[in-house]
């Protein structure tokens, strides 16, 4: 028993240091968590526009297109980076109820352009740059 007590006294500082260093390395190596950002479909002044119209995000972030005030609105991606599918990212269903939303996670760096089918001619278009 005395043998184990003397070992623990000698190695306790070393063991503590090893645990501290290992914990620090594990925490510092953790990837940054992905963010969720919102784009309003329609402005607070009832204009048929996306707000903001242009957005920059990090790869892996999620964009929520939130129905604001009056619709109907949708999100159709037309130009996307190579390797992505515009139809797969798009939401053709028209949102009508305020507060309803459509989420999409963008993982490939590049520029994504999108529009609202009913209001494209009125300028309801936007871009997302993924870095």
Swiss-Prot record:
Cofactor(s) needed: Cu(2+)
CDD domains: Plastocyanin (cd04219)
Span of domain Plastocyanin-like: 35-131
GO MF entry, a single one: electron transfer activity
Membrane topology: Peripheral membrane protein
Entry coiled-coil feature ranges: none
Subcellular location per the Swiss-Prot or TrEMBL entry: Cellular thylakoid membrane
Residues binding Cu cation: 73, 116, 119, 124
Keyword tRNA-binding recorded: no
CC terms in the record's Gene Ontology section: plasma membrane-derived thylakoid membrane
Manganese listed as a keyword: no
Keywords attached to this entry: Copper, Electron transport, Membrane, Metal-binding, Signal, Thylakoid, Transport
Position of the signal peptide: 1-34
Function statement: Participates in electron transfer between P700 and the cytochrome b6-f complex in photosystem I.
Similarity annotation: Belongs to the plastocyanin family.
Protein name: Plastocyanin
Taxonomic path: Bacteria, Bacillati, Cyanobacteriota, Cyanophyceae, Prochlorotrichales
Gene name in the database record: petE
């Amino acid at each position: 028993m005395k043998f184990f007590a003397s070992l623990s006294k000698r190695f306790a500082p070393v063991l503590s240091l090893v645990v501290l260093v290992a914990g620090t390395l594990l925490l510092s190596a953790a990837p940054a968590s992905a963010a969720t950002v919102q784009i309003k479909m329609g402005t607070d002044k009832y204009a048929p526009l996306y707000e903001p119209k242009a957005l920059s995000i990090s790869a892996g972030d999620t964009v929520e297109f939130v129905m604001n005030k009056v619709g109907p609105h949708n999100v159709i991606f037309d130009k996307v980076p190579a390797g992505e599918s515009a139809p797969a990212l798009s939401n053709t269903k028209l949102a009508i109820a305020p507060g309803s939303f459509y989420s999409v996670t963008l993982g490939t760096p590049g520029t994504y352009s999108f529009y609202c089918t009913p209001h494209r001619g009125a300028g309801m278009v936007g871009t997302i740059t993924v870095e």
